[in-house]
Amino acid sequence: MFPNILDDALVHFYTQKGNYGSIYYDNGKIEYIHYLPICSYDNKEYYLFHCNNKFEVIADYLFDSIEECMNMENRSKKEIVWIKNNCNEIY
């Protein structure tokens, strides 16, 4: 089950586990992106997180809306299916 909170941010949408690219570090380490959650803190901005297979955030990008987050990933990757996290309605 996908977490409702990541890095103290509320999860609004997420993807199924997949291969969404990788991040290469200067020290030679490679981390693979397995999840793409869209989250928010208490402000009105939204973050597109890149998470590893342990749901750890390894990169984030700030946008003004959920739609901007989705459009950014939909342009760079084909056929992303976004899953709405209905659990956030209890907060």
Spans of features found by a protein language model:
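Acidic-enriched, low-complexity/disordered segments with a strong bias for Aspartate over Glutamate
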Residues: 7-8, 26, 42, 60, ...
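Short aromatic-glycine-(Arg/Gly/Cys) micro-motifs in beta-strand/loop hairpins
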Residues: 30-58
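Mixed-charge, Lys/Arg-enriched low-complexity segments
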Residues: 52-91
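Negatively charged, low-complexity tracts enriched in Asp/Glu with abundant Ser/Thr
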Residues: 1-29
